[in-house]
Regions:
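Alpha-helical substrate-recognition element adjacent to the catalytic core
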Residues: 2-126
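Amphipathic coiled-coil/heptad-repeat helices and related helical stalk/stem segments
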Residues: 83, 147-150, 169
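Alpha-helical segments flanking ligand/cofactor-binding loops in enzyme cores
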Residues: 84, 88, 155, 173-174, ...
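Anion (oxyanion) recognition and catalysis
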Residues: 91, 113-116, 158, 177, ...
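Acidic, Mg2+-coordinating phosphoryl-transfer loop and its flanking beta/alpha structural elements
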Residues: 101-102, 161-198
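Substrate-recognition "cap/lid" segment bordering the active-site pocket of phosphatases
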Residues: 109-162
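Short acidic-hydrophobic, aromatic-tinged amphipathic segments that line or gate anion-handling sites
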Residues: 200-207
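Short amphipathic alpha-helix with an adjacent loop that forms part of the alpha/beta core around
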Residues: 210-214
Length: 214
């Protein structure tokens, strides 16, 4: 028996111990890395809306295809301890697993495959490249680049309930009105405004498994 039939998972600092766009920013030097990290922290604590920073960061970072491929490997290398095993057990109990992320889809898809999450259940921001792998832009229409975009996306999916959302940031916490529970994940980053609003607080995937499976 399961307590939740669907689980919506954040990626950066939840499924994997990396903030993808900040990692890409680090390739542009310490100053850009610090600037990007500051914006991420403020957005994840709900101090600034995500749409106020997303396009600006991407316009400066401008990741190449090869850098996205390198980031893909880092997502897998830094996967949260116990995540593979816990998610495999949830799948065995027919729990629907969904990734909803403000990260870059092409970098996240290999991690989804590694964790057994179907490609059509990965909601993230697509990035575009030219014939030589140079950055040409990102999907500016993506709901993931907007405040409350995750909430809208999850609502439109009409997942089988009860539904649990899991994440470390305010953009994850904001899903709460359209799901049945929200778990703040603190295994990589603890953000007090998120913890204060959470129904549950977990710091590892064994706890997630116990929460979902009765």
């Amino acid at each position: 028996m399961t307590r939740f039939n669907s689980v919506v998972l954040d990626v950066d600092s939840t499924l994997s111990g990396v903030e993808g766009i900040d990692w890409l920013a680090s390739l542009r030097g310490a100053e850009v890395e610090a600037w990007s990290g500051s914006l991420t922290a403020r957005a994840m604590e709900g101090l600034i809306p995500i749409e106020a920073v997303y396009g600006e960061r991407m316009g400066i970072v401008r990741p190449t295809l090869s850098e996205i491929q390198e980031l893909s490997a880092i997502y897998i290398d830094r996967v949260a301890p116990g995540a593979r095993e816990a998610l495999a057990e949830l799948r065995e109990h027919d729990v629907e697993l969904v990734m909803v992320s403000g990260g870059l889809r092409e970098a996240i898809l290999p991690l989804a495959k590694e964790l057994g999450i179907r490609e059509k259940r990965v909601h993230a921001v697509s990035v575009f490249f030219g014939s030589e792998g140079q950055y040409t832009g990102f999907d500016e229409r993506s709901l993931m680049t907007r405040q409350h975009g995750k909430r809208t996306t999850v609502k439109e999916m009409a997942l089988k309930g009860p539904v649990l959302a899991v994440g470390d940031g305010m953009t994850d916490c904001e899903i709460r009105p359209v799901v049945d529970g929200f778990a703040a994940f603190t295994g990589f980053m603890k953000r007090d405004p998120v913890v204060e609003r959470a129904d549950y607080v977990i710091d590892n995937f064994d706890q997630l498994r116990s929460l979902v499976l009765e």
